[in-house]
Amino acid sequence: MSSSIVLGVGGGIAAYKACELLRLFTESGHRVRVVPTASALRFVGAPTWAALSGQPVADDVWTDVHEVPHVRLGKQADLVVVAPTTTDLLAKAAHGLADDLLTNTLLTARCPVLLAPAMHTEMWEHPATVANVATLRSRGVRVIEPAVGRLTGVDTGKGRLPDPAEIFAIARQVLARGDIAPADLAGRRVVVTAGGTREPLDPVRFLGNRSSGKQGYAFARAAVARGARVTLIAANVSLPDPAGVDLIRVGTTAELREATVKAAVDADAVVMAAAPADFRPATYAAGKIKKSDDGVAPTIELVTNPDIAAELGQRKRPEQLLVVFAAETGDAEANGRAKLARKRADLIVINEVGPDKVFGADTNTVTVIGADGSVSRLPEQAKEAVADTVWDLVVARLPGSS
């Protein structure tokens, strides 16, 4: 669905990355007005923004005064994204200053506001910035955690602008909700698994599956947005790292099991969105397995992998929530109910698999069944929306939730 987006651009070296973010928005069919600060235009000129957006650049409260741009842009937007958000912009937004078109737009916006900070580590960690971020978040503004990496010059640390694809994914999540997520997971610790495991057969081959990790990453982002401390365990996922998570990368089912069981010990909720391989080769060939001269295929003996979800179900504390997944063919709901009982889980998310379904897509059609007998059948929708709905169900079941 096409939305009206204001893309604010702050005056930092990361301003050039906003060009890629703008491209992602426009290629998805969104209408984007770019509102750069005067300093941002010193990094990327107005003709670039106009060419990429197909819209005139809005950078001056004194241009087209009869259209009242300092009010109109914010009031008409479905989402305001500022990337990069400099230390100066954070301070102005927190204190309600309005000395240019972008800060005026932030004050008049009645839609969700998403800020992507980029600055040196010392500036991000300064008590004034910490207080400004806390103020903005308390008012419902979504402030993304900066990434860790190379900064301007030779410095490295926290303060790097998140990957444009990651900012875009978070924006999709906000648009799917229509608002900023409630902080109903604040103080909670959750574990999310994502992707698909691979079981090596020889140095070049493996047994695996087609899981992209998109649904699991959507769960992780949604949990961060709702205030949770998130441990994301990713198995062979080729997606930008979600902002604000503790990321653990694994390859095999054994590695996934070890990381998940350890992380789940003190978690309030565990979402097993990863697709572990059910089987692995009984032996690993140190050299590449060759074709035989007679054309006979080799026999590969398989052994069963540990059932991570079932182990988590046996280990889980009474107050802990476990969400498992089932990618099914045939009678999906009946198979899902049986799996829910076997795993001793609280919720199961069931989706039917087949050509052009689920794997790698941006949308999902699922049925969520609870151990209490509840059934929620969700229509096809963005995976971000699926994640938010499931988190709603989890929050409602967590002890102490109102």
Regions found by a protein language model. Name each.
Residues 1-402:
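A cross-family phosphate/adenosyl-ligand binding-site feature
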